[in-house]
Structure formats: C-alpha cells, structure tokens
C-alpha cells in the first residue's frame, strides 16, 4: 500500500532533507544554484538542479519535506517561489541577519566526548558554519550529541554571556545562535539516559 500523496516514506524524506541541507547550506554551486544573502533560492532552479543530479523531485514533495521536517530546517517564502535553509550555512554567499534576542538562563550544546579536550581549550566555535548552534532543551542537545559518538551535554550560562556583551540570535525553528561560546561559560553534564 502506497502512502497518501502528501506523505513520503521516511527514507525518502530523510534523503531529500539531506540533499536540501547540503545544497541550501553548504554547496549550492554543485548544481549551479544561486542563493541570495539571506539564503533564498528559486524553487524551480532547485528542482531543475536536483533533477540534473539524477534525483528528480517535484514542488509538492519539497513542500511536504518543508512542512514535515522534524527540525523545521527549511522555510518557504510567503509567495511560495523560494526556499531556504533556516540556519546552518557554511557557504560565504549567505550572510543571514537574525534579530538579536535575549536568551534564556541556560542553553545546551550536544557533542561527543571525543571533542571535549578541544572544547575545554577553545570553547565552542562555529567551525565551517557561521554560528555556534545551541538548543533550548537537553533532549534536543542529546539528539545532536548522539550523532557523533558517546554524547555529552554542555550547559551554557547564556544569561551571563549576554550580560557580558555576547549577542544571541534565535532562528525561526528555535535554534539559538551565537558567534562563539568561551569555555568559561560551559559546564559539562552527563547525558541523561534515553
């Protein structure tokens, strides 16, 4: 039995989401896709580029992936003609401007134990991305950390950082962003049992 037209099998949704993340965050040039400084791309150009990769996708499927993605990674423009990744960009073309926001008392970052020595030495840095990504809750941070090995949760004293001049932003999907988190604002927490 096939799923209804507006539902995708989980494996297909994951594959398409990963393709969109790669193209809209990191490598639009691989399909000749143009992004504006806010990360928007023309949906028709994206569909044509993905088809050239041998993975045809239609507009309805893109809309379904955007609407059902558990992390709300993608956004469609109000007129339905453009699409973008909400955050996570590494391509220098994109320089999204997020509104500054006052963070909650604590934010969280999920990582793996193998990265702790580096984090203890230099804090959290964005690496190839434009910002450090922080979660508003431990469960989300744990899911992120689990992807990379034995997870550990880093608690960020976000209010103290903010009071001391660090700027925070919040993306449309609830992911908190900042330029870096110095080690002095981090506390290691054991990952809770799943």
Where are these regions (language model features)?
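Eukaryotic, polar/proline-rich low-complexity intrinsically disordered regions
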Residues: 1-194
């Amino acid at each position: 039995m096939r799923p209804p037209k507006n539902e995708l099998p989980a494996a297909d949704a994951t594959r398409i989401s990963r393709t969109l993340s790669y193209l809209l965050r990191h490598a639009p040039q691989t399909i000749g896709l143009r992004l504006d400084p806010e990360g928007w791309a023309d949906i028709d150009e994206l569909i044509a580029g993905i088809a050239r990769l041998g993975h045809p996708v239609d507009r309805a499927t893109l809309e379904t992936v955007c609407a059902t993605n558990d992390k709300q990674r993608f956004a469609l423009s109000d007129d339905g003609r453009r699409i973008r990744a909400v955050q996570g960009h590494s391509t220098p073309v994109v320089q999204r401007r997020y509104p500054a926001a006052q963070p909650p008392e604590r934010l969280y970052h999920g990582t793996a134990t193998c990265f702790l020595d580096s984090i203890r030495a230099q804090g959290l840095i964005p690496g190839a991305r434009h910002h450090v990504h922080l979660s508003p809750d431990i469960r989300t941070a744990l899911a992120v950390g689990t992807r990379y090995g034995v997870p550990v949760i880093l608690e960020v004293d976000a209010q103290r950082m903010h009071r001391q001049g660090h700027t925070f932003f919040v993306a449309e999907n609830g992911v908190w962003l900042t330029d870096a988190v110095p080690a002095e604002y981090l506390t290691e927490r054991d990952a809770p049992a799943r």
